[in-house]
């Protein structure tokens, strides 16, 4: 059984409200943040957002995306802390020993799948969340956990993934290639896969192999110059436009 509890009062800035929450799952508390439009008057799509390694539910990029999705597109957007990140542990950088130790737990990916499932269960009880129109955004660690989740939850209609692959230093540290081999072919929803051409953590060829392994036929690959932490200025708007194509299809 899952239960949503608000941990903060809603704070409104312009067209967007932000509010912290926790989801209870099997005795564990999953901390998260919800962004939503102040003027929502009908059920709206929901985008689940996974942060990168060393990040947390309120890091700069996640907050920017939450405000973009809620303020410019009128959607709900939610982020939760990954294991041992943010309110769940000490990791503030992917080089922390605790980050490597996290990946040594064979059950860690399934636990995060269950956390996301429980979070969606809980948020779906909100009046203005349209649980039939759910998207996912997550690159780097957001894909390492998010790809298996998207493959496992048929409620997700489209996903933005990337900055991850089958080879590279991050793969050697985490062993995530084993999970990608299990789950990539089970991803059947539309996917936008974004990669950095000179990524120093996930090798270029390994990212292309992961893209090829995705089971969906509705997929596209966007490559940008730069290293792992770089972002093209248009990349986030491209991601939002991709999600809009599937989450708002059929709207008047």
Model segments located where?
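A fold-wide structural signal in alpha/beta-hydrolase
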Residues: 46, 71-83
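The feature captures the conserved acid-bearing segment of alpha/beta-hydrolase catalytic domains
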Residues: 169-223
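C-terminal catalytic histidine-bearing segment of alpha/beta-hydrolase fold enzymes
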Residues: 216-252
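Alpha/beta-hydrolase active-site loop
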Residues: 95-127
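The serine-hydrolase catalytic nucleophile loop
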Residues: 54-67, 78, 82
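N-terminal cap/lid segment of alpha/beta-hydrolase-fold proteins
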Residues: 1-42
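Short beta-strand element of the alpha/beta-hydrolase
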Residues: 42-52
